[in-house]
Amino acid sequence: MSKLRVGVVGLGGIAQKAYLPILSQAADWTLVGGFSPNQQKAQPICDSYRMACFSGLDSLAQQCDAVFVHSSTASHFQVIGELLRYGVHVYVDKPLAETVEQGEQLLALAEKQGKALMVGFNRRFAPLYRQLKQDMNQPASIRMDKHRADSVGPNDARFTLLDDYLHVVDTALWLGGDAGQRLSGSLRINDVGELVYAEHHFECGETLVTTSMHRRAGSQRESVQAVTDGAIYQVNDIRQWLREDSQGVLEQPAPGWQTTLAQRGFDGAIRHFLASVSNQTLPETAGEQAIAAQRVIERLLRDANL
């Protein structure tokens, strides 16, 4: 079987930091090339990864089986729609689109075209989070915190919730069993409409789930704590694992050989998508799973009149 031909749309920071370093290590696929409207900036990036620099989305799509989209959220609806109509499988950075309605249209188009459309919720593929989900026995509560040292603004609260808090909601509800009912919560917005703090409480079956983010906490800390039947688990910064029970505390650091991109789930997400395309199976974060957390965020925004 011939190797998958892979392309990249949008060659900014996230593509350069998280995706191209993995995609360029092609073994089971071929990295064909990239496209960005800013050809002057795109050319040296493509040259550095020894891939073609395409002048248009159409010409890239015609040479690819699957494309990774890292362009602005505002462009997602148009870019993904075009790629799907060209018959290309698509992986896109979260959120899927600017609105849930646009996302639903893209999911319907992907189903109609018979193509995979996966949203890159990389934390679902972080090894320690996957281990936690597997090992938890009857979790009573799960709490996820993802804070920023000093990142209030410059964007408004809506942008920050869809750009960053979305990760917290998606990961926490996935750990809790996906379908969550919101019980309570609060958004603290400053005088110019920027998010300062968010905390929400959900019920996922028998599990209570809490999400929390402070934009000026003086720390970049990310942690998940799970209180379960027989043990308490703590995962710190996606690289340190602690399990406490009656026998004591077991600490399991991430393997020294494991890259940061693997720890944070980017490597797993990329390989899962490409394997799904090759095997013609549905990616984990496709369909309703691609948009469930965004539905929650949009309800938070409506309830807060944002």
Describe the predicted segments one by one.
Residues 163-240, 267, 271-280:
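Contiguous beta-strand/loop segments that form the cofactor/metal-binding neighborhood of enzyme cores
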Residues 15, 55, 92, 117-119, ...:
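Hydrophobic residues in well-ordered beta-strands that form the structural core
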Residues 120-127, 150-182, 269, 289-290:
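Mid-domain beta-loop-alpha active-site segment that forms a flexible
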